[in-house]
Amino acid sequence: MYTDLKDKVVVITGGSTGLGRAMAVRFGQEEAKVVINYYNNEEEALDAKKEVEEAGGQAIIVQGDVTKEEDVVNLVQTAIKEFGTLDVMINNAGVENPVPSHELSLDNWNKVIDTNLTGAFLGSREAIKYFVENDIKGNVINMSSVHEMIPWPLFVHYAASKGGMKQMTETLALEYAPKGIRVNNIGPGAMNTPINAEKFADPVQRADVESMIPMGYIGKPEEVAAVAAFLASSQASYVTGITLFADGGMTKYPSFQTGRG
């Protein structure tokens, strides 16, 4: 646990499910004030809010589409209005849908790029704007993927969004380091999240993925949440412009480098 995270105001996009929910609960355990953004499932968001509060934190929920500029502006401003400030912005909302590249529609391409990359840019921009205007040494954490560095069949749009995020994060980190604002990525590998539930329910597919992970198992959302808490804490005060991979060593596995699909 990180005592300096108590009462910090943390905004998490896509915070009602999967990795976002795990991070929300972890910051609740740290007694932070958590702003849970959700897209359309209010019941799920309310459940996440309750879980954060039961863990020891405070929480509010804010509906919004991260691809819409006005929604992201509202999200950040609501956090500031409700809790008085902003300390940590976690751009976690993301989508993926494997499609053969020659069959990928422009609408599908745009949906993934707009959600994963543009959404993260908007969240980063609004948070950094507030940090700069108020002389706050704030923290931005973007949820990337092992695919920011590893190509993968059927994921051209997703890999492009994460590769773009890598350069965006590094550029922002360099630009705002003199102001004490830190910007980092987390790069999860294969995770036990709702988006992967159907795939990993198949023993054959699960075993195939596990065979590419040196540590031998599919990651838990709580393991990514632990990385987020570290990066948000003062223990990571000299860390900026990196991607911290939580992948069980997957990016180092030789066959993974070939883009097995």
UniProtKB/Swiss-Prot annotation:
Residues binding substrate, per UniProt: 145
Positions annotated to bind NAD(+): 11-35
SUPFAM superfamilies registered for this protein in UniProt: NAD(P)-binding Rossmann-fold domains (SSF51735)
GO BP annotation list: lipid metabolic process; monocarboxylic acid metabolic process
PROSITE patterns recorded: ADH_SHORT
Source superkingdom: Bacteria
InterPro entries assigned to the protein according to its UniProt record, in alphabetical order: NAD(P)-bd_dom_sf, Sc_DH/Rdtase_CS, SDR, SDR_fam
E.C. no: 1.1.1.47
Keywords: NAD, Oxidoreductase
GO MF term list: glucose 1-dehydrogenase (NAD+) activity; glucose 1-dehydrogenase (NADP+) activity
CDD domains membership: GlcDH_SDR_c
Family statement: Belongs to the short-chain dehydrogenases/reductases (SDR) family.
Miscellaneous notes: Prefers NAD to NADP; very unstable compared to the other isoenzymes and 2M NaCl enhances its pH and thermostability.
Subunit-level organization: Homotetramer.
Name this protein carries in UniProt: Glucose 1-dehydrogenase 3
Taxonomic source organism: Priestia megaterium (Bacillus megaterium)
Protein encoded by which gene: gdhIII
